Amino acid sequence: MVNLNQSLGDLFKGIIPNVYVLGATIVSFLVLFLFITYFVYRPLKKYIKKRKDFLQNHIDLTIKSNVEAEKLEKKSQQKLLETKEFCIELKEKSQIEANKFLEDAKKTAIDNARQLINEGQKVLLEYENEIKSKYYMNVINVAVEICQKYLEKQDKNNKILQQSLIADLEKELRKRENSSKKKDNFGK
């Protein structure tokens, strides 16, 4: 048992610490704790906080950018719709104006064509009247010439006829005179 007591005594000797060793252990622990706290934990905590703030800042900026992007997208969609509506209105207006311009151009062309046709008809009528008057003048001139020739021929024929009638009448008168002279001569 002595052995047992001695071994238990040795055992408990190692369990009960020495005050100096315990104080040195506590001081070294405190120094190590302060060293780790000031040189490892705090810089690591600051770095983690900076990193967390940096990431949170980027997350906030990303969220803000996404919100702004959504707003800009909505604005651009709205502007796109407005632009499409404006284009549709512009297209309709331009079609209406083009149709109006075409109608006006058609009317103007038709009016000009009618005016040209009327002027052409007037020119044709004037030309036709001029040709008719020339034709009538030619016909009249030809008729006058024919009449003159006919009258000249008739005048010649009349003169010849008149001369032949005068000659026949003279012959007849001579015959009567001769026959009346013969009767007078017989009757004497």
UniProtKB/Swiss-Prot annotation:
Predominant subcellular localization, coarse grouping: membrane
Species, as recorded: Mesomycoplasma hyopneumoniae (strain 7448)
GO annotations of cellular component type: plasma membrane; proton-transporting ATP synthase complex
Record keyword Manganese present: no
Keyword Ion transport in record: yes
Gene: atpF
GO molecular function terms attached to this record: proton-transporting ATP synthase activity, rotational mechanism; proton-transporting ATPase activity, rotational mechanism
Protein name: ATP synthase subunit b
Localization per Swiss-Prot or TrEMBL: Cell membrane
Membrane topology according to the record: Single-pass membrane protein
Signal sequence coordinates: none
Transmembrane segment boundaries: 19-39
Subunit annotation: F-type ATPases have 2 components, F(1) - the catalytic core - and F(0) - the membrane proton channel. F(1) has five subunits: alpha(3), beta(3), gamma(1), delta(1), epsilon(1). F(0) has three main subunits: a(1), b(2) and c(10-14). The alpha and beta chains form an alternating ring which encloses part of the gamma chain. F(1) is attached to F(0) by a central stalk formed by the gamma and epsilon chains, while a peripheral stalk is formed by the delta and b chains.
Coiled coil: none
Record function comment: F(1)F(0) ATP synthase produces ATP from ADP in the presence of a proton or sodium gradient. F-type ATPases consist of two structural domains, F(1) containing the extramembraneous catalytic core and F(0) containing the membrane proton channel, linked together by a central stalk and a peripheral stalk. During catalysis, ATP synthesis in the catalytic domain of F(1) is coupled via a rotary mechanism of the central stalk subunits to proton translocation.
Keywords: ATP synthesis, Cell membrane, CF(0), Hydrogen ion transport, Ion transport, Membrane, Transmembrane, Transmembrane helix, Transport
Membership in a protein family: Belongs to the ATPase B chain family.
S-S pairs: none
Protein origin, superkingdom: Bacteria
Pfam family, one: ATP-synt_B
